[in-house]
Amino acid sequence: MKLIILTGLVLFAIVSLIEAEEESGRVCIPLNGECSKSPDKCCDNINCDCYLRFEKGVQTGRPCFCTEKDVIFERDE
């Protein structure tokens, strides 16, 4: 009986540690942070917006940044 209780407590501790590690890995990306590799990790009320980058007519990348929701950026000419 003691062995069953001890085994249950050990399993509970292991599961708790695994859940704590998962939560610590969920740190959000702040405003203007780069989110190309993890677009779903921007902080609350912030979106991950991406744009295509071209150099001499050739696409050279797709950078993404966490920006405020409902904000539209326009190019200055």
Swiss-Prot record:
It comes from Lycosa singoriensis. Expressed by the venom gland. One of its GO terms (molecular function) is ion channel inhibitor activity. InterPro entries: Spider_toxin_CSTX_knottin, Spidertoxin. Residues 21-26 form a propeptide. Keywords: Disulfide bond, Secreted, Signal, Toxin. This is U10-lycotoxin-Ls1a. Contains 4 disulfide bonds. Residues 1-20 form the signal peptide. One of its GO terms (cellular component) is extracellular region.
